[in-house]
């Protein structure tokens, strides 16, 4: 029984360490990608609990010229860019050979679409992107 409890403690300890390391890298990536997509501002992830293995994650975003806010209070385009920033932050940890994006640019205005396309072009050195879009800027 002692060996089993010891093994469980070791697994929990390693899980906490790996989850914290991954969270820190994703948070750093998210903090870099968000201003690149928004042309400024800042964003971060916050663990909502004391115990990382039981904790949730809250997304805090501050688009340029706005106050820190929860993702729920953002406009449709701001939500799309924030979510894209987070997905790409996760994607950078373990990039796949291809990525399918289905109309993620639909709620974006032209300047945001151009920044989004610029980031995708940069990331396309490692990953092939397949788009479903109606946006002419994205098609170019």
Report each predicted region and the residues it spans.
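Terminal ABC-like ATPase head and other globular end-domains that cap long coiled-coil arms
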Residues: 1-140
